[in-house]
């Protein structure tokens, strides 16, 4: 199984939120994990926010940041190039879609052109519904 990791899924795993264990299993069993640099930015920003608001201690934030840094070394990270920007600027099957979600979906589409059959790993309902319309297998199932 190959997958594109969208931020909501990765964050659920890092934060131990609902669905996080299913995400962990999907990431662990994937042959290839592709993600946008946007995924890393969003995850780190949320981790910083959870520390700043007291949801997690500094040590807990550091542990989760280290965990993310460890797994990202095994992922194929995609930059936001002109093809992704152009696709994100166009309509998606289910609108409205948020800007960052459009970037993730556009990146997943570009990833799928390089790795056919790639699944979309997301826990965000809008991203999942749109991904289904775009023909992605969704993880977790």
What is the predicted function of each stretch?
Residues 40, 70-95, 102-107:
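Acidic catalytic patch
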């Amino acid at each position: 199984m190959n997958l594109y990791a969208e931020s909501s899924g990765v964050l659920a795993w890092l934060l131990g939120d609902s669905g996080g264990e299913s995400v962990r299993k999907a990431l662990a069993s994937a042959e290839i994990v592709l993600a946008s640099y946007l995924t890393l930015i969003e995850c780190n920003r949320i981790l910083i926010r959870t520390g700043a608001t007291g949801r997690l201690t500094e040590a807990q934030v550091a542990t989760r940041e280290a965990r993310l840094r460890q797994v990202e070394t095994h992922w194929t990270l995609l930059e936001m190039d002109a093809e992704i920007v152009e696709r994100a600027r166009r309509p998606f099957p289910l609108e409205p879609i948020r800007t960052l979600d459009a970037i993730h979906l556009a990146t997943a589409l570009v990833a799928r052109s390089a790795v056919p059959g790639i699944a979309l790993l997301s826990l965000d309902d809008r991203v999942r519904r749109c991904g289904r319309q775009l023909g992605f297998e969704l993880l977790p199932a």
